Protein backbone atom coordinates (compact mmCIF):
# COMPACT_ATOMS: atom_id res chain seq x y z
CA UNK A 1 0.00 0.00 0.00
CA UNK A 2 1.29 3.41 -1.00
CA UNK A 3 0.34 6.81 0.37
CA UNK A 4 1.15 10.43 -0.39
CA UNK A 5 2.42 12.89 2.24
CA UNK A 6 2.60 16.55 1.19
CA UNK A 7 4.52 19.19 3.17
CA UNK A 8 2.75 22.56 2.94
CA UNK A 9 3.85 26.16 3.54
CA UNK A 10 1.47 29.11 3.93
CA UNK A 11 2.24 32.56 2.58
CA UNK A 12 3.05 33.68 6.13
CA UNK A 13 4.37 30.46 7.73
CA UNK A 14 7.04 28.20 6.24
CA UNK A 15 8.61 24.89 7.22
CA UNK A 16 11.63 25.10 9.51
CA UNK A 17 12.27 21.34 9.54
CA UNK A 18 14.36 19.80 6.78
CA UNK A 19 12.47 17.57 4.39
CA UNK A 20 15.09 14.86 4.97
CA UNK A 21 14.21 14.81 8.68
CA UNK A 22 10.48 14.55 7.95
CA UNK A 23 11.16 11.77 5.47
CA UNK A 24 13.24 9.82 8.01
CA UNK A 25 10.63 10.30 10.74
CA UNK A 26 7.89 8.89 8.53
CA UNK A 27 9.71 6.22 6.51
CA UNK A 28 13.04 5.41 8.19
CA UNK A 29 14.00 1.87 9.11
CA UNK A 30 16.22 2.86 12.06
CA UNK A 31 14.93 6.29 12.99
CA UNK A 32 15.97 7.77 16.35
CA UNK A 33 15.50 11.18 17.87
CA UNK A 34 16.89 12.92 20.98
CA UNK A 35 16.21 16.45 22.18
CA UNK A 36 15.65 18.44 25.35
CA UNK A 37 13.78 21.60 26.37
CA UNK A 38 12.61 23.41 29.49
CA UNK A 39 8.97 23.24 30.51
CA UNK A 40 7.70 25.05 33.61
CA UNK A 41 11.26 25.48 34.80
CA UNK A 42 12.22 21.83 34.44
CA UNK A 43 14.43 20.30 31.80
CA UNK A 44 12.71 17.60 29.76
CA UNK A 45 14.90 15.12 27.89
CA UNK A 46 13.21 13.08 25.18
CA UNK A 47 14.46 9.95 23.47
CA UNK A 48 12.47 8.13 20.84
CA UNK A 49 13.05 5.26 18.47
CA UNK A 50 11.00 4.31 15.47
CA UNK A 51 9.41 5.92 12.44
CA UNK A 52 5.76 5.98 11.42
CA UNK A 53 6.49 3.15 9.01
CA UNK A 54 8.01 1.12 11.85
CA UNK A 55 5.00 1.82 14.04
CA UNK A 56 2.49 0.40 11.59
CA UNK A 57 4.71 -2.49 10.61
CA UNK A 58 5.19 -3.47 14.25
CA UNK A 59 1.59 -2.87 15.32
CA UNK A 60 0.35 -5.09 12.52
CA UNK A 61 2.94 -7.78 13.28
CA UNK A 62 4.28 -7.39 9.76
CA UNK A 63 0.88 -7.61 8.06
CA UNK A 64 0.93 -3.97 7.00
CA UNK A 65 3.97 -2.54 5.22
CA UNK A 66 3.02 0.99 4.10
CA UNK A 67 5.03 3.15 1.74
CA UNK A 68 4.86 6.88 2.46
CA UNK A 69 6.07 9.17 -0.34
CA UNK A 70 7.01 12.56 1.13
CA UNK A 71 6.69 15.49 -1.32
CA UNK A 72 7.29 19.23 -0.89
CA UNK A 73 7.17 21.62 0.73
CA UNK A 74 4.84 23.51 -1.58
CA UNK A 75 3.26 26.88 -0.79
CA UNK A 76 -0.51 27.34 -0.92
CA UNK A 77 -2.06 30.64 -1.99
CA UNK A 78 -3.22 32.11 1.33
CA UNK A 79 -1.99 32.70 4.87
CA UNK A 80 -2.61 30.20 7.67
CA UNK A 81 -5.57 32.09 9.13
CA UNK A 82 -7.46 31.86 5.84
CA UNK A 83 -7.62 28.08 6.21
CA UNK A 84 -7.45 27.75 9.99
CA UNK A 85 -9.45 30.53 11.62
CA UNK A 86 -12.40 29.33 13.65
CA UNK A 87 -15.88 29.73 12.20
CA UNK A 88 -18.66 28.34 14.42
CA UNK A 89 -16.08 26.22 16.28
CA UNK A 90 -14.69 24.71 13.06
CA UNK A 91 -11.66 25.59 10.96
CA UNK A 92 -12.62 27.76 8.00
CA UNK A 93 -11.20 25.90 5.00
CA UNK A 94 -8.59 23.19 5.64
CA UNK A 95 -10.00 21.17 2.73
CA UNK A 96 -9.13 24.03 0.40
CA UNK A 97 -5.55 23.78 1.63
CA UNK A 98 -5.56 20.06 0.83
CA UNK A 99 -6.94 20.57 -2.68
CA UNK A 100 -4.41 23.31 -3.44
CA UNK A 101 -1.56 21.14 -2.14
CA UNK A 102 -2.59 18.25 -4.38
CA UNK A 103 -2.84 20.52 -7.41
CA UNK A 104 0.60 22.01 -6.67
CA UNK A 105 2.30 18.59 -6.71
CA UNK A 106 0.32 17.21 -9.66
CA UNK A 107 3.10 17.86 -12.17
CA UNK A 108 5.52 15.69 -10.19
CA UNK A 109 3.10 13.09 -8.80
CA UNK A 110 1.12 10.40 -10.60
CA UNK A 111 -2.00 10.13 -8.46
CA UNK A 112 -2.97 6.86 -10.14
CA UNK A 113 -0.30 5.03 -8.13
CA UNK A 114 -2.08 5.96 -4.89
CA UNK A 115 -5.31 4.19 -5.84
CA UNK A 116 -4.17 0.86 -4.47
CA UNK A 117 -7.49 -0.94 -5.01
CA UNK A 118 -8.27 0.72 -8.36
CA UNK A 119 -11.69 2.01 -7.29
CA UNK A 120 -11.19 5.44 -8.82
CA UNK A 121 -10.24 7.14 -5.55
CA UNK A 122 -6.83 7.95 -4.09
CA UNK A 123 -6.69 5.88 -0.91
CA UNK A 124 -5.23 8.63 1.22
CA UNK A 125 -3.40 11.93 1.20
CA UNK A 126 -1.76 13.30 4.33
CA UNK A 127 -0.80 16.97 4.60
CA UNK A 128 1.73 18.20 7.14
CA UNK A 129 1.31 21.96 7.32
CA UNK A 130 4.00 24.40 8.49
CA UNK A 131 3.92 25.79 12.00
CA UNK A 132 1.71 24.92 14.95
CA UNK A 133 -1.62 23.14 15.31
CA UNK A 134 -4.58 24.14 17.44
CA UNK A 135 -4.78 20.77 19.23
CA UNK A 136 -1.45 21.21 21.00
CA UNK A 137 -1.35 24.87 21.87
CA UNK A 138 -1.49 26.76 18.58
CA UNK A 139 -3.67 29.88 18.43
CA UNK A 140 -7.21 29.99 17.03
CA UNK A 141 -5.95 30.72 13.52
CA UNK A 142 -4.06 27.45 13.28
CA UNK A 143 -5.57 24.24 11.92
CA UNK A 144 -6.75 21.42 14.17
CA UNK A 145 -5.27 18.07 13.01
CA UNK A 146 -8.05 15.92 11.62
CA UNK A 147 -9.20 13.57 8.90
CA UNK A 148 -12.13 14.29 6.58
CA UNK A 149 -13.47 13.93 3.04
CA UNK A 150 -13.12 16.61 0.36
CA UNK A 151 -16.42 15.61 -1.23
CA UNK A 152 -18.18 15.92 2.14
CA UNK A 153 -16.87 19.50 2.29
CA UNK A 154 -18.21 20.18 -1.21
CA UNK A 155 -14.75 20.09 -2.79
CA UNK A 156 -14.06 18.14 -5.99
CA UNK A 157 -10.45 17.29 -6.75
CA UNK A 158 -9.75 14.94 -9.67
CA UNK A 159 -6.15 14.45 -10.75
CA UNK A 160 -4.74 11.92 -13.22
CA UNK A 161 -8.21 10.44 -13.52
CA UNK A 162 -8.51 9.76 -9.77
CA UNK A 163 -10.60 11.53 -7.16
CA UNK A 164 -8.85 12.79 -4.05
CA UNK A 165 -11.40 12.49 -1.25
CA UNK A 166 -10.25 11.03 2.08
CA UNK A 167 -7.43 13.02 3.63
CA UNK A 168 -5.78 13.69 6.98
CA UNK A 169 -3.56 16.51 8.17
CA UNK A 170 -1.34 17.50 11.07
CA UNK A 171 1.04 20.25 12.13
CA UNK A 172 4.81 20.48 11.76
CA UNK A 173 5.75 22.13 15.08
CA UNK A 174 4.91 21.52 18.75
CA UNK A 175 4.19 24.85 20.45
CA UNK A 176 5.24 23.51 23.85
CA UNK A 177 8.71 22.35 22.83
CA UNK A 178 9.40 24.43 19.70
CA UNK A 179 10.65 21.24 18.05
CA UNK A 180 8.88 19.44 15.26
CA UNK A 181 6.12 17.10 16.34
CA UNK A 182 6.72 13.38 16.67
CA UNK A 183 4.89 10.61 14.87
CA UNK A 184 1.98 10.43 17.32
CA UNK A 185 -0.47 12.71 15.54
CA UNK A 186 0.46 11.30 12.13
CA UNK A 187 -0.14 7.73 13.33
CA UNK A 188 -3.43 8.74 14.97
CA UNK A 189 -4.78 10.50 11.90
CA UNK A 190 -3.51 7.85 9.52
CA UNK A 191 -5.33 5.25 11.64
CA UNK A 192 -8.55 7.01 10.60
CA UNK A 193 -7.50 6.56 6.99
CA UNK A 194 -7.28 2.84 7.75
CA UNK A 195 -10.85 2.94 9.07
CA UNK A 196 -10.47 3.20 12.84
CA UNK A 197 -12.63 5.72 14.75
CA UNK A 198 -11.67 8.07 17.58
CA UNK A 199 -12.05 6.62 21.06
CA UNK A 200 -12.19 9.94 22.88
CA UNK A 201 -15.42 11.89 23.31
CA UNK A 202 -15.60 13.74 20.00
CA UNK A 203 -18.07 16.56 20.81
CA UNK A 204 -15.45 18.31 22.93
CA UNK A 205 -17.87 18.73 25.82
CA UNK A 206 -17.46 15.43 27.64
CA UNK A 207 -15.91 15.42 31.12
CA UNK A 208 -15.71 11.67 31.66
CA UNK A 209 -12.76 9.38 31.13
CA UNK A 210 -12.40 7.32 28.00
CA UNK A 211 -9.53 4.93 27.25
CA UNK A 212 -6.88 7.66 27.52
CA UNK A 213 -3.18 7.00 27.02
CA UNK A 214 -3.73 3.28 26.50
CA UNK A 215 -4.82 3.84 22.88
CA UNK A 216 -3.47 5.56 19.77
CA UNK A 217 -7.10 6.57 19.05
CA UNK A 218 -7.41 8.55 22.28
CA UNK A 219 -4.67 10.30 24.30
CA UNK A 220 -1.96 7.82 23.30
CA UNK A 221 -0.54 9.92 20.43
CA UNK A 222 0.88 12.26 23.08
CA UNK A 223 2.84 9.58 24.97
CA UNK A 224 6.51 10.57 25.32
CA UNK A 225 5.83 14.03 23.94
CA UNK A 226 4.12 12.59 20.89
CA UNK A 227 7.12 10.48 19.87
CA UNK A 228 6.14 7.01 21.11
CA UNK A 229 2.44 6.24 20.61
CA UNK A 230 1.19 3.00 22.17
CA UNK A 231 1.06 -0.09 19.99
CA UNK A 232 -2.30 -0.94 18.51
CA UNK A 233 -4.42 -2.51 21.23
CA UNK A 234 -5.92 -5.95 20.88
CA UNK A 235 -9.19 -4.35 19.79
CA UNK A 236 -7.57 -2.15 17.16
CA UNK A 237 -5.63 -5.09 15.73
CA UNK A 238 -8.77 -7.24 15.86
CA UNK A 239 -10.74 -4.58 13.95
CA UNK A 240 -8.02 -4.41 11.30
CA UNK A 241 -7.82 -8.19 10.94
CA UNK A 242 -4.25 -8.28 12.25
CA UNK A 243 -5.05 -10.33 15.35
CA UNK A 244 -7.40 -13.22 16.04
CA UNK A 245 -8.25 -13.38 19.76
CA UNK A 246 -8.90 -16.74 21.35
CA UNK A 247 -12.45 -17.23 22.60
CA UNK A 248 -12.22 -18.67 26.10
CA UNK A 249 -15.19 -20.68 27.33
CA UNK A 250 -14.27 -23.42 29.79
CA UNK A 251 -12.66 -23.06 33.20
CA UNK A 252 -8.97 -22.49 32.67
CA UNK A 253 -5.74 -21.44 34.33
CA UNK A 254 -4.71 -18.75 31.87
CA UNK A 255 -1.17 -17.75 30.98
CA UNK A 256 -1.06 -14.67 28.76
CA UNK A 257 2.11 -13.27 27.21
CA UNK A 258 2.80 -9.64 26.28
CA UNK A 259 0.67 -8.40 23.38
CA UNK A 260 3.34 -7.12 20.99
CA UNK A 261 5.60 -10.16 21.33
CA UNK A 262 2.90 -12.82 21.26
CA UNK A 263 0.23 -11.26 19.01
CA UNK A 264 -2.27 -12.96 21.28
CA UNK A 265 -5.32 -11.83 23.23
CA UNK A 266 -8.43 -13.42 24.70
CA UNK A 267 -12.12 -12.80 24.07
CA UNK A 268 -15.01 -13.40 26.46
CA UNK A 269 -18.61 -13.50 25.23
CA UNK A 270 -21.54 -13.85 27.63
CA UNK A 271 -23.05 -16.44 25.28
CA UNK A 272 -19.71 -18.28 24.96
CA UNK A 273 -20.01 -17.82 21.20
CA UNK A 274 -18.52 -15.30 18.78
CA UNK A 275 -17.87 -15.02 15.04
CA UNK A 276 -14.39 -13.51 15.70
CA UNK A 277 -14.79 -10.87 12.98
CA UNK A 278 -13.38 -7.64 14.36
CA UNK A 279 -15.12 -5.14 12.08
CA UNK A 280 -18.48 -6.95 12.09
CA UNK A 281 -18.63 -8.71 15.47
CA UNK A 282 -21.47 -10.98 16.51
CA UNK A 283 -22.44 -10.80 19.31
CA UNK A 284 -21.73 -7.07 19.27
CA UNK A 285 -20.92 -6.98 22.99
CA UNK A 286 -17.79 -8.77 24.16
CA UNK A 287 -14.67 -8.38 26.28
CA UNK A 288 -11.02 -8.44 25.28
CA UNK A 289 -8.12 -9.29 27.57
CA UNK A 290 -4.54 -8.41 26.71
CA UNK A 291 -1.17 -8.20 28.44
CA UNK A 292 0.33 -4.73 28.16
CA UNK A 293 3.91 -4.20 29.32
CA UNK A 294 6.04 -1.06 29.24
CA UNK A 295 8.25 -2.26 26.40
CA UNK A 296 8.63 -1.28 22.75
CA UNK A 297 5.90 1.10 21.64
CA UNK A 298 4.20 0.62 25.01
CA UNK A 299 7.20 1.91 26.98
CA UNK A 300 5.39 5.10 28.01
CA UNK A 301 2.07 3.61 29.07
CA UNK A 302 0.85 4.63 32.55
CA UNK A 303 1.38 1.10 33.87
CA UNK A 304 1.48 -2.59 32.98
CA UNK A 305 -0.57 -5.73 33.47
CA UNK A 306 -3.82 -7.27 32.30
CA UNK A 307 -5.96 -4.83 30.34
CA UNK A 308 -9.68 -5.58 30.18
CA UNK A 309 -11.79 -3.81 27.56
CA UNK A 310 -15.54 -4.01 27.03
CA UNK A 311 -16.64 -3.52 23.42
CA UNK A 312 -20.24 -2.66 22.50
CA UNK A 313 -20.12 -2.38 18.73
CA UNK A 314 -22.63 -0.16 16.97
CA UNK A 315 -22.20 0.31 13.22
CA UNK A 316 -23.70 3.80 13.25
CA UNK A 317 -21.48 5.01 16.09
CA UNK A 318 -18.38 3.66 14.36
CA UNK A 319 -19.40 5.22 11.04
CA UNK A 320 -20.27 8.58 12.62
CA UNK A 321 -17.14 8.64 14.81
CA UNK A 322 -19.18 8.82 18.02
CA UNK A 323 -17.97 5.56 19.57
CA UNK A 324 -17.50 6.90 23.11
CA UNK A 325 -19.83 9.89 23.10
CA UNK A 326 -22.20 8.34 25.64
CA UNK A 327 -20.76 7.85 29.12
CA UNK A 328 -23.51 5.34 29.89
CA UNK A 329 -22.74 3.14 26.89
CA UNK A 330 -19.24 3.57 25.58
CA UNK A 331 -18.35 1.53 22.51
CA UNK A 332 -14.81 0.73 23.64
CA UNK A 333 -14.62 0.99 27.42
CA UNK A 334 -11.58 0.33 29.59
CA UNK A 335 -12.65 -1.60 32.69
CA UNK A 336 -10.55 0.05 35.39
CA UNK A 337 -9.21 -2.61 37.72
CA UNK A 338 -9.33 -0.28 40.72
CA UNK A 339 -12.88 0.76 39.87
CA UNK A 340 -11.90 4.42 39.72
CA UNK A 341 -13.19 6.35 36.72
CA UNK A 342 -11.83 9.90 36.92
CA UNK A 343 -14.37 12.53 35.93
CA UNK A 344 -12.00 14.95 34.21
CA UNK A 345 -8.53 15.43 32.80
CA UNK A 346 -7.41 17.01 36.07
CA UNK A 347 -7.49 13.73 37.97
CA UNK A 348 -6.15 11.07 35.71
CA UNK A 349 -7.81 11.32 32.31
CA UNK A 350 -4.73 9.96 30.57
CA UNK A 351 -4.58 6.78 32.64
CA UNK A 352 -2.99 5.30 35.74
CA UNK A 353 -1.26 2.11 36.84
CA UNK A 354 -4.37 1.01 38.75
CA UNK A 355 -6.35 0.77 35.51
CA UNK A 356 -4.83 -2.67 34.92
CA UNK A 357 -4.78 -5.92 36.87
CA UNK A 358 -3.18 -6.88 39.24
CA UNK A 359 -2.02 -3.35 40.16
CA UNK A 360 -5.60 -2.16 40.64
CA UNK A 361 -7.21 -5.44 41.73
CA UNK A 362 -6.64 -9.18 41.46
CA UNK A 363 -10.13 -10.17 40.32
CA UNK A 364 -13.04 -9.03 38.19
CA UNK A 365 -16.49 -10.49 38.77
CA UNK A 366 -18.47 -8.10 36.61
CA UNK A 367 -19.21 -10.58 33.81
CA UNK A 368 -21.93 -12.94 35.03
CA UNK A 369 -20.65 -16.53 35.30
CA UNK A 370 -17.33 -15.53 33.73
CA UNK A 371 -15.11 -14.78 36.71
CA UNK A 372 -11.52 -13.57 36.40
CA UNK A 373 -9.69 -14.33 39.65
CA UNK A 374 -6.24 -14.59 41.22
CA UNK A 375 -4.64 -12.30 38.66
CA UNK A 376 -0.87 -12.18 39.06
CA UNK A 377 2.12 -11.09 37.04
CA UNK A 378 5.56 -12.68 36.90
CA UNK A 379 8.39 -11.74 34.55
CA UNK A 380 5.97 -9.89 32.29
CA UNK A 381 3.54 -12.82 31.97
CA UNK A 382 -0.03 -12.58 33.28
CA UNK A 383 -1.66 -15.49 35.11
CA UNK A 384 -5.27 -15.79 36.25
CA UNK A 385 -8.06 -18.27 36.88
CA UNK A 386 -10.99 -18.10 34.52
CA UNK A 387 -14.35 -19.42 35.75
CA UNK A 388 -12.66 -20.73 38.86
CA UNK A 389 -9.76 -22.30 37.01
CA UNK A 390 -8.79 -25.94 37.29
CA UNK A 391 -7.24 -27.69 40.24
CA UNK A 392 -3.53 -27.02 40.32
CA UNK A 393 -0.41 -27.74 42.34
CA UNK A 394 -1.16 -28.87 45.88
CA UNK A 395 -4.89 -29.02 45.14
CA UNK A 396 -4.13 -31.98 42.87
CA UNK A 397 -2.00 -33.81 45.44
CA UNK A 398 -3.97 -35.57 48.15
CA UNK A 399 -3.01 -34.69 51.69
CA UNK A 400 -2.13 -38.30 52.49
CA UNK A 401 0.44 -38.37 49.70
CA UNK A 402 4.05 -37.41 50.28
CA UNK A 403 5.95 -35.66 47.51
CA UNK A 404 9.15 -37.51 46.69
CA UNK A 405 10.45 -35.40 43.78
CA UNK A 406 9.38 -32.78 41.24
CA UNK A 407 10.56 -32.58 37.61
CA UNK A 408 9.96 -29.87 35.02
CA UNK A 409 8.71 -30.73 31.53
CA UNK A 410 12.31 -31.14 30.35
CA UNK A 411 12.83 -33.90 32.90
CA UNK A 412 15.07 -31.80 35.13
CA UNK A 413 14.71 -32.51 38.82
CA UNK A 414 13.81 -29.48 40.90
CA UNK A 415 15.56 -28.71 44.16
CA UNK A 416 12.30 -27.92 45.93
CA UNK A 417 9.61 -30.39 46.92
CA UNK A 418 7.15 -27.62 47.75
CA UNK A 419 5.09 -26.99 44.62
CA UNK A 420 3.96 -23.53 45.70
CA UNK A 421 7.56 -22.31 45.85
CA UNK A 422 8.18 -23.06 42.16
CA UNK A 423 7.64 -20.66 39.23
CA UNK A 424 4.46 -21.00 37.18
CA UNK A 425 4.69 -23.85 34.73
CA UNK A 426 4.00 -27.55 34.14
CA UNK A 427 5.64 -30.19 36.34
CA UNK A 428 5.64 -33.93 36.96
CA UNK A 429 5.19 -34.62 40.66
CA UNK A 430 6.32 -37.99 42.02
CA UNK A 431 4.55 -38.95 45.25
CA UNK A 432 4.31 -42.03 47.42
CA UNK A 433 1.11 -42.86 45.53
CA UNK A 434 2.55 -42.50 42.03
CA UNK A 435 3.18 -39.60 39.64
CA UNK A 436 1.02 -36.98 37.95
CA UNK A 437 1.32 -33.88 35.78
CA UNK A 438 0.67 -30.65 37.64
CA UNK A 439 -0.03 -27.16 36.29
CA UNK A 440 1.34 -24.51 38.64
Predicted regions and their residues:
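Fold-level signature of zinc-dependent metallopeptidase catalytic domains
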Residues: 1-28, 85-90, 131
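Active-site-proximal beta-strand/loop segments in catalytic clefts of secreted hydrolases
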Residues: 6-11, 128-132, 169, 196-197, ...
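Non-catalytic C-terminal accessory/binding modules of secreted extracellular proteins
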Residues: 16-72, 137-176, 246-391
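Acidic, glycine-anchored loop motifs typical of Ca2+
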Residues: 111-124, 278-282
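Active-site recognition of the HExxH zinc-binding catalytic motif
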Residues: 127, 184-199, 289
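Secretory-pathway/luminal and periplasmic proteins that interact with or process carbohydrate-rich
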Residues: 132-146, 202, 225-226
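Post-HExxH zinc-binding segment in Zn-dependent metallohydrolases
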Residues: 207-248, 374
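C-terminal outer-membrane/trafficking sorting elements
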Residues: 391-440
Amino acid sequence: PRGLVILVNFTDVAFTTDKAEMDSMLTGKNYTRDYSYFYRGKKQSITSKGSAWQYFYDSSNGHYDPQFDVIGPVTVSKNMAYYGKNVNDFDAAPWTMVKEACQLVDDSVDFKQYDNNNDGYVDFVYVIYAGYGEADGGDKNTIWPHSYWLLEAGITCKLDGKYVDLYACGNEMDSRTNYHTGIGTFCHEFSHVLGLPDLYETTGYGTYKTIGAWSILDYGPYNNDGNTPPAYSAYEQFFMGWLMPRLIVDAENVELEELQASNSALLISSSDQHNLIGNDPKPTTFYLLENRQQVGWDEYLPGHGLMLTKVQYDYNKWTNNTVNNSSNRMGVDLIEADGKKPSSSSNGYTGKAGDLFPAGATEYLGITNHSIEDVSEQDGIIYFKYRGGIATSTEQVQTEETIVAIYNILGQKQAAVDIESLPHGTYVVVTTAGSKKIVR
